[in-house]
Swiss-Prot record:
Keyword Chaperone: no
Glycosylation sites: 1120, 1147
PANTHER family cross-referenced by the UniProt entry: PECANEX, PECANEX-LIKE PROTEIN 4
Family annotation (Pfam families): Pecanex_C
Membrane topology value: Multi-pass membrane protein
Transmembrane segments: 45-65, 73-93, 140-160, 173-193, 208-228, 244-264, 307-327, 357-377, 388-405, 448-468, 494-514, 534-552, 565-585, 607-629, 634-654
GO terms under cellular component: membrane
Keywords from the UniProt entry: Glycoprotein, Membrane, Transmembrane, Transmembrane helix
Annotated compartments: Membrane
InterPro entries on file: Pecanex (IPR039797), Pecanex_C (IPR007735)
Protein name: Pecanex-like protein 4
Primary localization class, coarse: membrane
Amino acid sequence: MSPDVPLLNDYKQDFFLKRFPQTVLGGPRFKLGYCAPPYIYVNQIILFLMPWVWGGVGTLLYQLGILKDYYTAALSGGLMLFTAFVIQFTSLYAKNKSTTVERILTTDILAEEDEHEFTSCTGAETVKFLIPGKKYVANTVFHSILAGLACGLGTWYLLPNRITLLYGSTGGTALLFFFGWMTLCIAEYSLIVNTATETATFQTQDTYEIIPLMRPLYIFFFVSVDLAHRFVVNMPALEHMNQILHILFVFLPFLWALGTLPPPDALLLWAMEQVLEFGLGGSSMSTHLRLLVMFIMSAGTAIASYFIPSTVGVVLFMTGFGFLLSLNLSDMGHKIGTKSKDLPSGPEKHFSWKECLFYIIILVLALLETSLLHHFAGFSQISKSNSQAIVGYGLMILLIILWILREIQSVYIIGIFRNPFYPKDVQTVTVFFEKQTRLMKIGIVRRILLTLVSPFAMIAFLSLDSSLQGLHSVSVCIGFTRAFRMVWQNTENALLETVIVSTVHLISSTDIWWNRSLDTGLRLLLVGIIRDRLIQFISKLQFAVTVLLTSWTEKKQRRKTTATLCILNIVFSPFVLVIIVFSTLLSSPLLPLFTLPVFLVGFPRPIQSWPGAAGTTACVCADTVYYYQMVPRLTAVLQTAMAAGSLGLLLPGSHYLGRFQDRLMWIMILECGYTYCSINIKGLELQETSCHTAEARRVDEVFEDAFEQEYTRVCSLNEHFGNVLTPCTVLPVKLYSDARNVLSGIIDSHENLKEFKGDLIKVLVWILVQYCSKRPGMKENVHNTENKGKAPLMLPALNTLPPPKSPEDIDSLNSETFNDWSDDNIFDDEPTIKKVIEEKHQLKDLPGTNLFIPGSVESQRVGDHSTGTVPENDLYKAVLLGYPAVDKGKQEDMPYIPLMEFSCSHSHLVCLPAEWRTSCMPSSKMKEMSSLFPEDWYQFVLRQLECYHSEEKASNVLEEIAKDKVLKDFYVHTVMTCYFSLFGIDNMAPSPGHILRVYGGVLPWSVALDWLTEKPELFQLALKAFRYTLKLMIDKASLGPIEDFRELIKYLEEYERDWYIGLVSDEKWKEAILQEKPYLFSLGYDSNMGIYTGRVLSLQELLIQVGKLNPEAVRGQWANLSWELLYATNDDEERYSIQAHPLLLRNLTVQAAEPPLGYPIYSSKPLHIHLY
């Protein structure tokens, strides 16, 4: 990668310079890129200043004492409401009057770039350009009303006398009045005239026109605080807040332009998550619907607890609902309902009831403990001697033990020091299991302590608190509702918070504000917020330092401006630190602009970073099937690893990266609760691009240093500490390993190719015999033929030959076939299967269809005598309608189909279908090729059949079938015709190019080609035999020659049972992977290196390496990606921000984003993992 790849290409730079001023001003377009009449700019200025004009009228009347403040607000609001309706109806009139096609009202770059032809100041095209209008009539009315309210309340908010009362400064009042009205005009223009494209874009499409509401929403928030201050007296805090917000009000345009303030939809979801997690003790949820439902239920629980009069009742209510809301109730209900319908009896249903019984017992014990401790224990102020202090000491010990047991499970302790207890040099599953046994036992102990011991210990601590003894207040209800919920929802964090609160209380004086003014519930709430923000701050700081340092230390990342940016970051480091702190307080991503060390505060958004539900979209391709097979097994193994603590502390928003060969799995935790965790797994594309390969190579290096090296020192350091990826553990998963071998020395060997032809006939015989013996209805008729005294007559299959081809058919067939066999295509990696004349001869399939040949004598068909009264001698006449015209002197070479009779009454059980017994080759050619038929192999295969239940009769019957000459002749005819179709006219050894083509389903032209392709089932069997033979040739070259027929059958049975041999592009290839065939094989050709390759997939238990990613690095890069693509429209595939970065894993992070911004090839729906 060149370090000076442009951040934005010339076109996008020009586009950005036109769009950004429009965003700053709220919608006016003063930089168009083409010449426009002056009235275009004048009209926009008038529309922009219109709210200020009406607000100025009201303000002037108020200052002159003519109107009171609320009448002033009403007057300005009414005038603006009338103006808004006029503006909107003018837009509607222009649309109806215009004869041009109305443009689509979406974010369309091309539409923004179109040049408009303006005819007059008030022309339809001018009005449509200035006022695009609304998509929905409801929004036309609603937005107009909001515009009137915003103008009226804004006038009231910015009255000079009011501002002077707040600050007592005339100069400050003038500045706030001027810039405040600029802010108000920007918001009004965006709402009612033309909506600007916001830098804070959450949704890819604004379907319901929510974006215009963004700026007025913040206007209303600021005004609401001022109104509260007006009507609520004696609240100094509210007055200070109002003063601060009046100052911030003038900076709103800059916050809107920088994208710091979220749009309404993102703000709502973010606010619900924050309140649910820190105010109500819950967790962020896997879907927006679950978030809404859980938020309502949790808020209802907190409110209901306030109205319970009994203190014991309050404690029991909080304990019970805290436990129940921390469970995955929806999944449990769905599972029980599904099993009651689909699995009425089975171990899985019993397991679900055991699970429910376990939860009921835990709930009963928790309620019993809470009530007993609350009722009987003494409630004195906490001290070192009372019972709550004793429980606090126990919690400290428990926290230390759990931390040690968790860190032992990972390869690195706190991500820095090598864990001496973790297995070293783990490369195979067997070695891993041998060395991991002790750690798994420790993991079980940890899980018991975390799931059973810790919650009850914390419930004891909370139940003994004196705050619950007296009359409960709002703060007590909120704090303890959260505390009793956190005990179950996030046990490890709750334990840490409880220990901190207990420790601070024990070591500090009782007279300080912390102990005197706050109850235990509020202390826990504040400690929880501080804990979360401190972890975020450390992660953000580490991310910022990594971006800053690598921009200089990594040569491929160093640009001409890097030195300047580094110096500026050092000089303004306090300001950069303020940005990081502000981003941490808002819990919003730290946005590195273009992933350079230029940091901005991204707008707050949900923890998932994307508006849609996880797993709804993915860029599906041929490689997706590997993830479909792997994810269920990976999920099962993750359950054990998460329960043991191998992946560290499980928090919503955590990201993990799994690696195996060329596969990369991106794992994100969506939701956590008591004994469950919800995750999303994404599969990234296999290594193709150079950027992807470079970062994947660095991931391999990080994992190799962690898992595949012997360390001499006991506690060595993590050499890749600055990387966003920290190795955690390895997971044994049953999946496909991908091996690619060079076959050039085998497939082009003359001796191997010579043996190939003979082996092909044997494999054809075996496959056809196996197919016929296992056809539906064959085994059911085994006993029906034993009582028959006479062998059945075998009528020739008449009227099954293809009708004469038209010249167009012949030309089409020849051109397609010879194009496939041209020299340009012999090196294709996977020749495509040509479905030749599949629908060409549909007429022949119609019952009773006879084609009349001009000049011929019409013969009577056997099928015409439906009554069955056919003279016996007529049955022996072969009707050969449909054959090409030939010379009379050469008619002895034409095929003749006599009526035949099996010598064995059981032969029809392995007889070929009637349509396969038709002839298409001259008799002389068939006799010539019949000498190649291996009769001894044919008889051996028949004797090996297992189609009889009576073993004493089986050998005799199979011997009779093997000696049936008529049956053998049928097999000779069909096998040799297939053989002739696969190899063409030449009887020489095939070339490697020929092998590759036929393997791909492209057969050479021959007189038998049509005959074979018209029988799709037989065609597939012949192709299958050819592929089996190729695999047999490779195995013989690798493992040695085959000694006897039994060993050959062993090979073929293994292919049939354990292998799929075909093309990667086949649908059956994907089906075989999903069915978990043990092995898959495909033949290919590398045209760059000129070698033949074999690809073998082997299903086996192998180790997947898993590491934890810095969550703030992921969120920051995703925030930049969203800004670049949705606002700057920087979709250049070679842009700087998508290039490989070995420490930030920038390219992989972009891939893992939700489509359409990212492009994972697989994305699972939320997967619920049970942690017990």
